[in-house]
Swiss-Prot record:
It comes from Prochlorococcus marinus (strain MIT 9312). GO terms for molecular function: adenosylhomocysteinase activity. This is Adenosylhomocysteinase. Binds 1 NAD(+) per subunit. Belongs to the adenosylhomocysteinase family. It catalyses: S-adenosyl-L-homocysteine + H2O = L-homocysteine + adenosine. Keywords: Cytoplasm, Hydrolase, NAD, One-carbon metabolism. Gene3D superfamilies: Adenosylhomocysteinase-like, NAD(P)-binding Rossmann-like Domain. The keyword RNA-binding does not apply. NAD(+) binds at residues 199-201, 233, 262-267, 285, 320, 341-343, 386.
């Protein structure tokens, strides 16, 4: 298994689509830095201290312009980094080129094959005679690869029955690695201090491992920091969903009937996004609390089966499996748009469409003819639409998320003795600090409590202002 299109030197290995795009990438990174005050403040605060000196971070997260600012912040704070994207379509090639041009190992290009994806994930874990000691994950693929690979070292039969194309590529990549390095996964796993996880789906995987007493190292759940989930997931999706649909299709959203499946933070932002452009938005939910929230926001709460033939735009935002199945797909109206804004590609049963005629319109936009003769427009092959068909969330909201990531890496790397093999969240005072770092940029001024007021509600003048279980 050879890495194609790579350049190897004494300082770096990288795989990018076109290294000549680095100047373009650098220009956009400079603009993004002006919109990412949290990360820039951490550079100023910690640059001389270098709290990540000695950290060797294997990063698996969308290789975008905003992620480039995160990577360079980690490096400024002393870390060594190897990076891959956590999605085959989400890389911005000029961002990857700009990072590679700085001598940082990056393995990412837009439109990777599944085989390439798992090759590149192996690359961030393979440091030759050395080893990474931290993981920064988005969706849990880097963590999951180490765990599954360690199991395969002991019993190769765990790789015998792949369930889909993704697992075929994953299992083959592990078999290939074990042919030349029989204890690679367990060796690397034993050197990992901990992982910081970015997204809802990856966090769910971590909690499942914790429940099974199978978590191999401590983990910090960055996703459930308030300044991540209530900003990135909500406000980020509110802007990036319609951006991606319009870039992909040029469709008029006003007047269209849209169905958002899932009304968590991502679903809430998605529903607001579509309604903001004049769509008639309906919501499908399994959780009665979220369903009631949707109804109170003025959305019709329906089931997919009841409305499937009437919907113009389908958006899945559940983090679940086979939310839209073949029996739903074949009933869709002509030119219905189908997309997913959850992390993985299995919310929509795309595999069941493979036997139907496909016409590629442009990258990540496919026309599929159903048995009825109707055609549907599938975006990003059912993968993350906002990164497959657009450039993801705006820089400012990603500054919130990535500031949390940097703080989590600093915390776990420097205070590993405090943490058992469990899943943790960042403390409230750090959440509030992240928010403070972003207020000046938008001209927001905080009111300050008096000592008497603080005493009256039993908090410190400087915070934290809410109990840990407060629901924002």
């Amino acid at each position: 298994m050879v890495i194609a299109n790579s350049v190897k030197s004494s300082t770096t290995n990288y795989v990018v689509a076109d290294i000549s795009l680095s100047d373009f990438g650098r220009k956009e990174i400079k603009i993004a830095e002006t919109e990412m005050p949290g990360l820039m403040a951490l550079r100023d605060k910690y640059q001389s201290e270098k709290p990540l000196k000695g950290a060797k971070i294997a990063g698996s997260l969308h290789m975008t312009i905003q992620t480039a600012v995160l990577i360079e912040t980690l490096v400024d704070l002393g870390a060594e980094v190897k990076w891959a994207s956590c999605n085959i379509f989400s890389t911005q090639d000029h961002a990857a080129a700009a990072i590679a041009d700085q001598g940082i190992s990056v393995y990412a290009k837009k439109g990777e094959t599944l085989d390439e994806y798992w090759q590149y994930t192996h690359c961030i874990l393979d440091w030759g005679a050395d080893s990474p000691n931290m993981i920064l994950d988005d969706g849990g693929d880097a963590t999951g690869l180490l765990i599954l690979g360690s199991k395969a070292e002991k019993d190769l039969s765990v790789l015998d029955n792949p369930g889909n194309e993704e697992e075929i590529a994953l299992f083959n990549s592990i078999k290939y690695k074990l042919e030349t390095d029989s204890d690679f996964y367990s060796r690397i796993k034993s050197n990992i201090i901990g992982v910081t996880e970015e997204t809802t789906t990856g966090v769910a995987r971590l909690y499942q491992l914790q429940k099974q007493n199978a978590l191999p190292f401590p983990a910090i759940n960055v996703n459930d920091s308030v300044t991540k989930s209530k900003f990135d997931n909500l406000y980020g999706c509110r802007e990036s969903l319609v951006d991606s649909i319009k870039r992909a299709t040029d469709v008029m959203i006003a007047g269209k009937v849209a169905l958002v499946m899932g009304f968590g933070d991502v679903g809430k932002g998605s529903a607001q996004s579509l309604r903001g452009l004049g769509a008639i938005v309906k919501v499908a939910e399994v959780d009665p609390i979220c369903a009631l929230q949707a109804a109170m926001e003025g959305f019709s709460v329906v089931t997919l089966d009841d409305v499937v033939e009437d919907i113009d735009i389908f958006v899945t935002a559940t983090g679940n499996y086979q939310v839209i199945t073949n029996k739903n797909l074949v009933k869709m109206k002509d030119e219905a748009i189908v997309c997913n804004i959850g992390h993985f590609d299995n919310e929509i049963d795309v595999a069941s469409l493979k036997d139907y005629p496909w016409e590629n319109i442009k990258p990540q936009v496919d026309h599929i003819t159903l048995p009825s003769g109707n055609k549907i427009i599938l975006l990003a092959e059912g993968r993350l639409v906002n990164l497959g068909c657009a450039t993801g969330h705006p820089s400012f909201v990603m500054s919130n998320s990535f500031t949390n990531q940097v703080l989590a890496q600093i915390e776990l790397f420097n205070k590993s003795e405090k943490y058992a093999k469990e899943v943790y969240v960042l403390p409230k005072h750090l959440d509030e600090m992240v928010a403070r770092l972003h207020l000046d940029k938008i001209g927001a001024k905080l009111t300050k409590l008096t000592e008497e007021q603080a005493d009256y509600i039993n908090v410190s003048v400087e915070g934290p202002y809410k109990p840990e279980l407060y629901r924002y």
